[in-house]
Amino acid sequence: MKSALHESRADTAEGTSSASSAWKSVRALPARTLIFFIELYRTYVSPLRMPTCRFMPTCSEYAVESLRTHGTIKGLLLTVVRLAKCAPWHPGGWDPVPARHDRHAGSRRCCPANVDEQRST
């Protein structure tokens, strides 16, 4: 038999979970909107033009992938930098979207490994 305290904690955890997923959906909305317009471009405008992109993946593929990987702000910034490279003086070639880095990965350990070794000597 569950206690009232246990049930209220479970309800709170479920509420937090659904609120968190709702917040993620709201945060993803601008990126999804941009991806929608990029897909419109790829479907209706791009086929009418000669293929001229000098990069792999193409600039529109890069934009969609960067928005999905990094979110709206950083994805848009990466896309603008990529489009700025699209000029006759840049050779083009393979230019993938950079991998997403965990921003908290460095904060898990406060000290370099050798500090503990120095303390023991």
Swiss-Prot record:
Chief site of localization: membrane
Keyword Cell division set for record: no
Subcellular location: Cell membrane
Stretches that traverse the bilayer: none
Summary of the function given for this chain in its UniProt record: Could be involved in insertion of integral membrane proteins into the membrane.
Family in the record: Belongs to the UPF0161 family.
Protein name: Putative membrane protein insertion efficiency factor
Origin species: Rhodococcus opacus (strain B4)
